[in-house]
Structures are given as C-alpha cells and as structure tokens.
Amino acid sequence: MTAQLIDGNALSRQLRTEVAARTAALKSRGITPGLAVVLVGDNPASQVYVRNKVKACEDVGFHSVLEKYDASMSEEQLLARVQALNNDPSIHGILVQLPLPKHIDDHKVIEAISPLKDVDGFHVASAGALMVGQVGFKACTPYGCMKMLESIGMKDLRGKHAVVIGRSNIVGKPMAMMLLAANATVTVCHSGTADLAAMTRQADVVVAAVGKRNVLTADMVKPGAVVIDVGMNRNDEGKLCGDVDFEGVKQVAGYITPVPGGVGPMTITMLLVNTLEAAERL
C-alpha cells in the first residue's frame, strides 16, 4: 500500500480562490483587508517567509505593508510600532515575524498586538479562546492541518485517536486543542515521553511537529493512518525535508503530507483567511 498525498499546494490554491472572491465582495463595500508584516533583523529564512506572505496578500487583493528594521531596533521602538499599527484603521492584521533578536522579548511583543488584529493566533487571548471554544484567531499552522484533514473527509474525528508529537505554543498545543474540538481522543507526546512508538502505533492521525528529522519512521505508524508532517528541516544533501521518514512511512500510511508542498503553503493560506475574517468582523 502506498499512501495518498494530501497536496497542500492544490488545497491552498482552492482556498485562496475563495479568499479572493470574499475579498472582492468586501472591496465592493469599500473595505480592503490589510496586513502589516514586521521584520526585525536579517534572518535569511525570515526574509523568505515574509516575501511569501506579502506576495500571497497581493495575489488575493489585500493591502499589505512590509516594515523592515535593523536588528539593532530596541524593544521599546518595536512596541511603539506595534501600537501604531493597532491604531491604524487600514490594517486588520499584524504579523511580527519570529524569531526576533535576542534583546527583544517575543512574548511581550506578541501580547502588545491587539487581539482583534492577532492574525497569527499567538496572543494569549487567542489561545484562551481556542481553549474554551470561543471565537478567536486560530494559530495558522494547526488551522491549516485541520483543513487538510477536512479535505479528506475527516472534519469530525469522533472515535479517532490523534497523536501530536511536539508541545510548542505555535503548533503542538493549539494542534491538540483543535483536534479535541473535532472530537478526537488526543495524546500529546514530547521529549519527556517514555515510549513514543507505543503511542504513535495506536494513532489514526499523527501530527509530527518537533523540527527533528526522522522522528517518525514506518515501524511507528499504524497501517492506514493519516500522517501530517509539520517539520521543516534539511537532509544531508541540503534538501528540504520534514520530521517524518517520508519514503518509509508512505508505504504504511493511508494519507501523508509531503515536505515541501504540504503544510507550508497551508500556513500562509490560513494567515490570509484570518486577515480576511478580521476585516469582515468590522
């Protein structure tokens, strides 16, 4: 058995077409969704991510603002810029690209963003809303993973066991909460888990999100399981790869996401969805 691919590029194109149509409808009422992206420093990976986000905005008809600052920018200066963007009525979403320089407190900056413009879904208000099932912005990567599950008919996960590998605030924790909201029975595994394979072999859905190559191999996967690979790593040849041993696991799984072309494009797409919804809520 060879797993079916869940094509993140194809699903992203479909969703972005819907976003563009809803954006056009908003524009006819005089509202153009606006996203401000703030980049501090010259991290090469961050520069690529930021360019991709700005281009995606332009492609669906958003107004986008890219603010680039030198790595020497002070925390106080950055907080002042965030406050100015909070007060700008043409901006509906604010994204501060992480990581920030070491002298700036990531948490303090994220909490300075208005919850009404927290389209990354990282603010404690967004995390709290997710926890208690209220309306709020969902973290983009796990939100994209849920859309991928939905695309293969797995919107309701009642009776399914989902295992999340990783407990970060950006992916692991919100992923677990979204799976729980979809009625899955959820297990969260991490560096303190005694027997990871014993957990994953029981899983109908596995989400790997630790940033470590080959954390999930074929012998750890239940036949027919759905495997979502959030990882972004480089192999020995320097090529992009995920957390999953793709070649091995695809022989066992029922569905699998590739890297690249899986979760990555969905993350940016859900950022667009969140920004659009921020504008629609006005």
Curated annotation (Swiss-Prot):
Oxidoreductase as UniProt keyword? yes
Where do transmembrane segments lie in this chain?
none
According to UniProt, this protein's pathway is:
One-carbon metabolism; tetrahydrofolate interconversion
Its domain of life reads Bacteria
The GO molecular function terms of this record are:
methenyltetrahydrofolate cyclohydrolase activity; methylenetetrahydrofolate dehydrogenase (NADP+) activity
**InterPro entries to which the protein is assigned, alphabetical:** Aminoacid_DH-like_N_sf, NAD(P)-bd_dom_sf, THF_DH/CycHdrlase, THF_DH/CycHdrlase_cat_dom, THF_DH/CycHdrlase_CS, THF_DH/CycHdrlase_NAD-bd_dom
Q: Which UniProt keywords apply?
A: Amino-acid biosynthesis, Histidine biosynthesis, Hydrolase, Methionine biosynthesis, Multifunctional enzyme, NADP, One-carbon metabolism, Oxidoreductase, Purine biosynthesis
Q: What single Pfam family name could you report for this chain, choosing any that match?
A: THF_DHG_CYH
Protein role:
Catalyzes the oxidation of 5,10-methylenetetrahydrofolate to 5,10-methenyltetrahydrofolate and then the hydrolysis of 5,10-methenyltetrahydrofolate to 10-formyltetrahydrofolate.
Q: Which family does it belong to?
A: Belongs to the tetrahydrofolate dehydrogenase/cyclohydrolase family.
Subunit (UniProt)? Homodimer.
Protein name as it appears in the record: Bifunctional protein FolD
Q: Which organism is it from?
A: Acidovorax ebreus (strain TPSY) (Diaphorobacter sp. (strain TPSY))
